[in-house]
């Protein structure tokens, strides 16, 4: 199966993505497929400080409970509150309405992330 891996995003080996232009973070299409139907998402609060690769939340599916990791260090500037009542958005639109948080971050942190080609190779 082929998964969508947008070229304009950066990725973690743990399957989170970040949009370098906006700081928006989510999980990849591959990750949501592996998880199965998402039934609950726990996220940080606006204003919380995150360190790169530290836990930023939890996603619970019918198959598993998985930790979510911060692709960069920074301050949470927005949280996708829609996921409280519609966690299935993570499955339906992992790169769209299923985003998790937005982070104000230092672009130097992107050096420790994967580009789309490297991420595609990881999930192949």
From Swiss-Prot:
Task: Report whether Iron shows up as a keyword of the record.
Answer: no
- Cofactor annotation remark: Binds 1 lipoyl cofactor covalently.
PROSITE patterns cross-referenced by the UniProt entry:
BIOTINYL_LIPOYL, LIPOYL
Ranges for the Lipoyl-binding domain? 22-104
**Which Gene3D superfamilies does the annotation name?**
2.40.50.100
At what positions is N6-lipoyllysine found?
63
Cofactor(s) named in the record: (R)-lipoate
Cellular component annotations (GO), alphabetically ordered: cytoplasm; glycine cleavage complex
Domain of life according to the entry: Archaea
Is the GTP-binding keyword given for this protein? Answer: no
Q: Which UniProt keywords apply?
A: Lipoyl
Q: Name one GO biological process term.
A: glycine decarboxylation via glycine cleavage system
Q: Name one Pfam family in it.
A: GCV_H
Question: Briefly, what is this protein's role?
Answer: The glycine cleavage system catalyzes the degradation of glycine. The H protein shuttles the methylamine group of glycine from the P protein to the T protein.
Quote the PANTHER family the UniProt record gives: GLYCINE CLEAVAGE SYSTEM H PROTEIN, GLYCINE CLEAVAGE SYSTEM H PROTEIN-RELATED
Enumerate the NCBIfam families for this protein: gcvH, PRK01202.1
The UniProt family comment states: Belongs to the GcvH family.
Q: How does it assemble?
A: The glycine cleavage system is composed of four proteins: P, T, L and H.
The protein here is known as: Probable glycine cleavage system H protein
Q: Which organism is it from?
A: Halobacterium salinarum (strain ATCC 29341 / DSM 671 / R1)
Q: Which gene encodes it?
A: gcvH
């Amino acid at each position: 199966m082929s998964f969508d891996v947008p070229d304009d995003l950066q990725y973690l080996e743990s399957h989170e993505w970040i949009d370098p232009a906006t700081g928006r973070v989510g999980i990849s299409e591959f990750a949501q497929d592996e998880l199965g139907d998402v039934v609950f998402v726990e996220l940080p609060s606006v204003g919380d400080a995150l360190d790169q690769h530290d836990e930023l939340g939890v996603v619970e599916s019918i198959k598993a409970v998985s930790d979510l990791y911060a692709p960069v260090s920074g301050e949470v500037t927005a949280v996708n509150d829609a996921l409280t009542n519609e966690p299935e958005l993570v499955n339906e639109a992992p790169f769209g309405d299923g985003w998790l948080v937005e982070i104000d971050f230092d672009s130097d942190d992107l050096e420790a992330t994967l580009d789309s080609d490297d991420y595609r190779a990881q999930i192949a």
